[in-house]
Regions:
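Active-site metal-binding motif and surrounding structural segment of the metallo-beta-lactamase
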Residues: 1-22, 126-134
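Short, glycine/charged-enriched secondary-structure capping and boundary segments
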Residues: 13-15, 36-37, 111-113, 148-151
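Residues that line or immediately flank small-molecule/substrate-binding pockets and catalytic motifs
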Residues: 2, 26, 138
Length: 159
């Protein structure tokens, strides 16, 4: 999704296996540094078999399909959280998978939206993404109605 370490921590294991890293151009230098970092105290698989990362860049949107199911990687940045940040959108399922843009914990009340969530909702609208469910890296899967409720609480708090 983006370059923060809690979302990119395992990338070296994938690179060691020869996986192609799909990201945005602005994140390339970060991932090149991660790939070239020396691990001498606790060598990992990439240290044992070093290789240069292979990149596939996403500029705005990249669609993957197997003929039955489609996944769109969409850059919803720049956002208050990261300049370039990808979401995975499954149009058939009306589902978006995102990291750090909107989240509600398990058994917690719906919070007032923060600036990042407000931006996320705006980008969903601008991009025409038809979303019913929002899967989160941190927190539970939520609904569009819960996002709207969160936005309503943010507006009410500012009045």
């Amino acid at each position: 999704t983006h370059h923060h370490e809690d979302h990119a921590g395992g990338v070296r294991a994938y690179l060691a296996e020869g996986a192609t890293l799909v990201t945005t151009a602005g994140n390339r230098a970060y991932f090149e540094r991660i790939a070239s970092a020396r691990r001498t105290i606790a060598p990992d698989d990439l240290s044992a078999k070093p290789r240069r990362p292979v990149f596939e860049m996403v500029s705005k949107r990249r669609t993957f399909s197997d003929g039955e199911r489609t996944v769109d990687l969409v850059d919803v940045g720049p956002s208050p959280h990261a300049n370039e940040i990808l979401v995975a959108y499954l149009p058939q399922e009306r589902l978006v998978f995102q990291a750090d843009l909107f989240g509600i914990g398990w058994g917690t009340p719906i919070p007032a939206a923060n600036t990042t969530s407000v931006h996320f909702a705006k980008r969903l609208q601008e991009l025409g993404l038809q979303v019913d469910r929002i899967a989160a890296v941190h927190g539970r899967t939520t609904t569009r109605a819960e996002l709207e409720e969160s936005l309503g609480k943010q507006v009410a708090a500012t009045q």
